[in-house]
Swiss-Prot record:
The lineage of its organism: Eukaryota, Metazoa, Chordata, Craniata, Vertebrata. Keywords: Cytoplasm, Cytoskeleton, Developmental protein, Differentiation, LIM domain, Metal-binding, Methylation, Osteogenesis, Phosphoprotein, Repeat, Zinc. The modification Phosphothreonine is found at residue 96. The modification Asymmetric dimethylarginine is found at residue 103. The keyword Lyase does not apply. This is PDZ and LIM domain protein 7. One of its GO terms (molecular function) is muscle alpha-actinin binding. GO terms for biological process: actin cytoskeleton organization; cell differentiation; heart development; muscle structure development; ossification; positive regulation of osteoblast differentiation. It comes from Rattus norvegicus (Rat). The modification Phosphoserine is found at residues 78, 111, 247.
Length: 457
């Protein structure tokens, strides 16, 4: 152990961090250094033990006491440190250069470039597979040998055109194991590389064009390529399968088309409503409309059958009213359903006014003073007659004697000395105390309290 002393010139920061202490039962030591800091420049290293701080033994200091001691040093910090001697380095074994590095060849081989083989050909086997197969034949009983081989058959690598065991079982069940897709046959032919031969004279051998793909007929294609519902019928969860043949219905004749259109129009038109591009059907007689027609209340009508329910008048022009599902002309509706005016007792057919739980013609409900129709404006009732707001304030409005402002409806007021007062305006003319409900005196039409009854106003 090498002990040495380090003096750092202030001010802080000092560029190191402590760890350990008496409270941790671990000697104080340097845990971290700031790169380029004062401690790093003075040669302090991570892991140095702190023996003393500013001349005081650090072995009896806790972690917090050591930090406080360092903070109290001010402009000069003296540390006694101890550093473990580095262990003697062991002689290193001389490194010998490795032998020639292994060389890898990327030439094509039989294991990497396999040629295509026809369906059903056995997969290629190597020595390792043959040894494993012999070992399995020795260990596995004959009863389970076949099942093991069948279960592991799909694990062996096979070319992209090979068929899995489950697919061959499905083909055997459906009777299509000997059928072959013409598209696959054409792909086989196209994948064959033509042999290169010496060019012959053009006159001796005629040049043949490359045959294009022939369109397969529906009968020569397998059922999984022709029938889109093949996979659904032979799903694993089906207990039995039934093959059925469906024939496409013949194209309907124009007469059948016309009959279906008529039936659709008759069925859809009886319900009324919108036509949606179909032949309109009269809502009254339930017959197909040929030519002009009317649309009212969401239904189609013959023009001559859209009539008043009471007088039978054709309502093609002039407007109509609908009441409880029945249609009326204006005159019949006025006689039967129109309300009566409370003033003139006549039927109200145009604009109507509702006031005082009665109905009025708008020109009949007017101000009693200016004769102006009140319509939707505010009005006041006085002695059974309506008044507009302006005339009512002019004729019956009340002003406060104290503030000279109008006493609105709903305001609290009182009457005294022959005038009307707001309850807050009836006060003593001298001390302004409120006199509502109290004894007061009057002098020159001004209220006075009992204390100022004889004062000069």
């Amino acid at each position: 152990m090498d002990s040495f002393k380090v003096v750092l010139e202030g001010p802080a920061p000092w560029g190191f961090r402590l760890q350990g202490g008496k409270d941790f039962n671990v000697p104080l030591s340097i845990s971290r250094l700031t790169p380029g800091g004062k401690a790093a420049q003075a040669g302090v290293a991570v892991g140095d033990w702190v023996l003393s701080i500013d001349g005081e033994n650090a072995g009896s200091l806790t972690h917090i006491e050591a930090q406080n001691k360092i903070r109290a040093c001010g402009e000069r910090l003296s540390l006694g440190l101890s550093r473990a001697q580095p262990a003697q380095s062991k002689p290193q074994k001389a490194l010998t250069p490795p032998a020639d590095p292994p060389r890898y060849t990327f030439a094509p081989s039989a294991s990497l470039n396999k040629t295509a083989r026809p369906f059903g050909a056995p997969p290629p086997t190597d020595s390792a597979l043959s040894q494993n197969g012999q070992l399995l034949r020795q260990l596995v009983p004959d009863a389970s040998k076949q099942r093991l081989m069948e279960n592991t058959e799909d694990w062996r690598p096979r070319p992209g055109t090979g068929q899995s065991r489950s697919f061959r079982i499905l083909a055997h069940l459906t009777g299509t194991e000997f059928m072959q897709d013409p598209d696959e046959e054409f792909m086989k032919k196209s994948s064959q590389v033509p042999r290169t031969e010496a060019p012959a004279p053009a006159s001796t051998i005629p040049q043949e064009s490359w045959p294009g793909p022939t369109t397969p007929s529906p009968t020569s294609r397998p059922p999984w390529a022709v029938d889109p519902a093949f996979a659904e019928r032979y799903a694993p969860d089906k207990t039995s399968t039934v093959l059925t043949r469906h024939s496409q219905p013949a194209t309907p004749t124009p007469l059948q088309n016309r009959t279906s259109i008529v039936q659709a129009a008759a069925g859809g038109g009886t319900g009324g409503g919108s036509n949606n591009g179909k032949t309109p059907v009269c809502h009254q007689c339930h017959k197909i409309i040929r030519g002009r027609y009317l649309v009212a209340l969401g239904h189609a009508y013959h023009p001559e059958e859209f009539v008043c329910s009471q007088c039978g008048k054709v309502l093609e022009e002039g407007g109509f009213f609908e009441e409880k599902g029945a249609i009326f002309c204006p005159s019949c509706y006025d006689v039967r359903y129109a309300p009566s005016c409370a003033k003139c007792k006549k039927k109200i057919t145009g604009e109507i006014m509702h006031a005082l739980k009665m109905t009025w013609h708008v020109p009949c409900f007017t101000c009693a003073a200016c004769k102006t129709p009140i319509r939707n404006r505010a009005f006041y009732m006085e002695e059974g007659a309506p008044y507009c707001e302006r005339d009512y304030e002019k004729m019956f409005g009340t002003k406060c004697r104290g503030c000279d402002f109008k006493i609105d409806a709903g305001d609290r007021f009182l009457e005294a000395l022959g005038f009307s007062w707001h309850d807050t305006c009836f006060v003593c003319a001298i001390c302004q105390i409120n006199l509502e409900g109290k004894t007061f005196y009057s002098k020159k039409d001004k209220p006075l309290c009992k204390s100022h009854a004889f004062s000069h106003v």
